[in-house]
Amino acid sequence: MRRLVLLLTISVLLYQDLPVRSEFEWDRICGYGTARCRNKCRSQEYRIGRCPNTFACCLRKWDESLLNSTKP
């Protein structure tokens, strides 16, 4: 009887899709290490592609004045 309960418990645990798996896929690094996988990009981010888990690969927007910084 104990074995039956143990086997039933193990099979129920293995059948469930554990939420830990989705936490690993959430906020994963993409874009050669410069972006993050998100369900939806934030307002200060650009969507640069798709992650393997079908989330958007979001890159943070940059300040253009920093890119053209030339000292006079």
From Swiss-Prot:
InterPro entries: Beta_defensin_dom (IPR025933). Disulfide bonds join C30-C57, C37-C51, C41-C58. Keywords: Antibiotic, Antimicrobial, Defensin, Disulfide bond, Secreted, Signal. Residues 1-22 form the signal peptide. It comes from the Eukaryota. One of its GO terms (cellular component) is extracellular region. Has antimicrobial activity. Belongs to the beta-defensin family. This is Beta-defensin 104A.
